[in-house]
Each structure stands twice: as C-alpha cells, then as structure tokens.
Amino acid sequence: MLNSLKGLLSRKNDVPSPTVISLGQVWVDIMMDIDAIPQPGGFAVANHTMPSVGGSFRVMQAASRIGAATKHAGVIGNGPWASLIRKALNDNGIEHIGQDRIDADSGFRLVLNDSERKTFVATYGAESQGNENTFDCVEPGEGDVVHISANTLMDHSASGIDAFLHRTASDPTTRDYSIVLNPTNTLHMVSDHLLEDLVLVQPIWSCNR
C-alpha cells in the first residue's frame, strides 16, 4: 500500500501539493497478548494490553510521514475511543474533513494474540454509520489520491462510496485524480452492484494479502 502511494505521489510532481484523502474507517484496536484462546465459557489472562488506532489510520499515517497532505473523510464519533482517534490524527498532521456524530462513540476491536494467530472481536461504532451523503464533502483535486478500504464497502457507508464514485469518478479516462482500493480479505462480502461500480472506475488495487 505504501509503495502504491509513493509511486502515485512521485508521478504527480508537476501538480502542486497532491493530497491523500482516505474514505476508510478508523477505529481503536485493543491488542491483548494471551497464552491461548480460552474455550467457550473459559477464562484467560492477558499478559499485555495495548490500545492503538487502527483501520485506515495506518495508511494515512504512512502518507503523512512521506510528506503528503493527508485528510480523513470518514465518520468519527463522540466518546473515549473517538477522542483517542482525534488525538492520533492531530498528532500525525492528518485533517479530519468528514462527519462527526455526537450520539455514538467510534468502534473498537479486541485482538486476542496467542503468538500463533490473532482472533478479532469487533464492535462497530460511528465509523460504520454513514449514508449516501457521507462523502459529499470530498472534492478531489488534480493529482490527488483517494484511498478506499473494503471495510467501508460493507455497511451503511457503502452507499456513500457508491454516491461518491458516481459523482466524481464515473469516467476513468477523464478523471484527474487516482483511486487506490485496499480490498483486504473481505471483498467477498461486498454487494455485486457496488463491486461492479468499483471495477468500472478502474482503481489501483492494493493487494497486500
């Protein structure tokens, strides 16, 4: 993913200040190191617990670190997890241009790590509560890079992605900005209609799995 961004930004040197705009979701990961996953009804003690901001934040952090102006267009909530996310964005020079929800906190994931594999338990929050107007604030300029993660394609925010594509990117031959799609391992859960629309706009596929 980072190599894709570096390549795109380096090819846009003739365009002033290209911006990376992420339409992905951001949540908090709570990593818990355990000796073994407990059986149903069992008990386990975490040796180490560390909360960190995850989701599309890592892509934006990488873009910011290589010197690109970086913006987050996803939804952020109101609460302790959202506060952690906002601080991480501010600390890394990432501007939040998306919607704010005051009636829900951002979500989090419990990540149980037994040294052999990771087990995930997700609680979805404000980041997943978008609609067809979620990304109306996004107006990519010439040379910009728009990042889309598959997580945003599987819930209410998916309608916002589809609306954004139809509004700004329907003809890839005339589009003056780039789209990078990170499908992760959940693309099979995306609706056929939205997947077809994504294929038609001819994004750059970042296949890192």
Go through each PLM region and give its residues:
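Ribokinase/PfkB-type carbohydrate-kinase core domain
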Residues: M1-V26, R86-R101, D114-R209
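Glycine-rich phosphate/adenosyl-contacting loop at the front of the ribokinase-like
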Residues: L2-V75, P80-K87, G143
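Glycine-centered flexibility motif
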Residues: G41, G77, G107, G125-A126
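Beta-strand->loop->alpha-helix junctions that form or flank phosphate-binding loops
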Residues: H48, A73-N78, E95-S106
